[in-house]
UniProtKB/Swiss-Prot annotation:
<feature type="binding site">
    <location>
        <position position="50"/>
    </location>
    <ligand>
        <name>[4Fe-4S] cluster 1</name>
    </ligand>
</feature>
<dbReference type="InterPro" id="IPR006638">
    <property type="entry name" value="Elp3/MiaA/NifB-like_rSAM"/>
</dbReference>
<comment type="function">
    <text>Catalyzes the methylthiolation of N6-(dimethylallyl)adenosine (i(6)A), leading to the formation of 2-methylthio-N6-(dimethylallyl)adenosine (ms(2)i(6)A) at position 37 in tRNAs that read codons beginning with uridine.</text>
</comment>
<keyword id="KW-0004">4Fe-4S</keyword>
<dbReference type="GO" id="GO:0051539">
    <property type="term" value="F:4 iron, 4 sulfur cluster binding"/>
</dbReference>
<feature type="compositionally biased region" description="Low complexity">
    <location>
        <begin position="453"/>
        <end position="462"/>
    </location>
</feature>
<keyword id="KW-0963">Cytoplasm</keyword>
<comment type="subunit">
    <text>Monomer.</text>
</comment>
<feature type="binding site">
    <location>
        <position position="88"/>
    </location>
    <ligand>
        <name>[4Fe-4S] cluster 1</name>
    </ligand>
</feature>
<dbReference type="InterPro" id="IPR038135">
    <property type="entry name" value="Methylthiotransferase_N_sf"/>
</dbReference>
<dbReference type="InterPro" id="IPR007197">
    <property type="entry name" value="rSAM"/>
</dbReference>
<feature type="domain" description="Radical SAM core">
    <location>
        <begin position="152"/>
        <end position="384"/>
    </location>
</feature>
<dbReference type="Pfam" id="PF00919">
    <property type="entry name" value="UPF0004"/>
</dbReference>
<dbReference type="GO" id="GO:0046872">
    <property type="term" value="F:metal ion binding"/>
</dbReference>
<dbReference type="Pfam" id="PF04055">
    <property type="entry name" value="Radical_SAM"/>
</dbReference>
<feature type="binding site">
    <location>
        <position position="173"/>
    </location>
    <ligand>
        <name>[4Fe-4S] cluster 2</name>
    </ligand>
</feature>
<dbReference type="InterPro" id="IPR002792">
    <property type="entry name" value="TRAM_dom"/>
</dbReference>
Amino acid sequence: MTPPRKLHIKSYGCQMNVYDAQRMVDTLAAEGFVETASAEEADLVILNTCHIREKASEKVYSELGRLRAAKDQAARDGREMSVVVAGCVAQAEGDEIIRRAPVVDVVVGPQSYHHLPQLLARAKADGRALETEFPVEDKFGFLPQPSRQAIRARGISAFVTVQEGCDKFCTFCVVPYTRGAEVSRPVAKIVEDVQRLADNGVREITLIGQNVNAYHGDGPDGRPWPFGKLLHRLADIPGIVRLRYSTSHPRDVEDSLIEAHRDLGALMPFVHLPVQSGSDRILEAMNRRHTADDYRRVVDRFRHVRQDIAFSSDFIVGFPGETEQDFTATLALVTQIGYAGAYSFKYSPRPGTPAAEMKETVSTADMDERLVRLQNLIDSQQSAFNRAAVGTTVDVLFERAARNPGQIVGRTAYLQPAHVVASADIIGQILPVTVASLERYSLLGSLASAPASRASADDAPPVGASSPAIMGV
């Protein structure tokens, strides 16, 4: 019997890339590949790249330098290692990667990874392969379903892509150029995916897309369904006890989504709603096509139907032309909304975007200082949000054994890690936890129906940090 070939995937960036990596694993499993944690031992290494962060390309080339040494060592050991660059950097800079990095065998954009087996065969025959065009066919129709064993191994929470691409064209963002126009999957296909996950032990589904609440996929009645109607349908699937989604655009919050938050107990009261700035002048320069007050009104609509709802967001400081007055408006918005957590970044130009051509730049010193001030405010809000849980009883969906022996860790409705001392048979259940204290960003407590037994958290990320949001909206 031929031994399985080893596959190593390193993903950068958002939840969509995590999902894409899983689907690449599923696609290549049929070709005899199994995952390995070691790039050095792999027969195939895939860098699944993100183009949002600063110096994204440089990080890819740095990693490719390390892989060149690993590939050379594999050749000396009599093994053949193939290297693939996938994702949004591949889409944006495919020709440049081929030119600069001879170690790379295949470059493939995020809309074409269902072609990986053919591209690997082409590279073996011709030396290298590049595919960064947007294919006419829907890739989801060509992707194999994950095996039952793969689903169970990935745990009780899963991502499902319902929408890809973005039509908003914010001036700072590369997503419309790397992921293409907005495309929504049919309702029936999404239901089929979620049903298969539920049948194999998944209890929590996070619906993902670059602009997920712009979803308008074809329903079984032949009409486009809004996102809220899709959520209602998925909430009816037996076994699914929690629904989440990311990432949302304020302009696409339709009444059906608000109604879903009002009506569905399975829909978690935690919304990632990026705003980027609190200054109307900067929002206009970003082509956000909403004002700060528009954003406040959207938040109010959510809160009107679900008083326990909480929000996270994204912010950019130092966008071209941002003044101290503009930045003060951002601080005012953060203060007024009150976030459970947020991501904040210094502006960095993305080649090919309109903002990259703007001349009125902000100094690095000013950006650094503003980022510290903003993050301090966000951190104080997150700390207050977490402290408010102490002394209360919260529902926790338990996910896995913690690193500390005897502990089980799960997450609250707000993605806060919660640790208790308990047996592993609670994994997959939602149980009440009495919160006794905090350790770093984690809640420590005991099962409400069991004798109190203080847990000690292993290192856990802040709210939202373990599952980075889909960037670009």
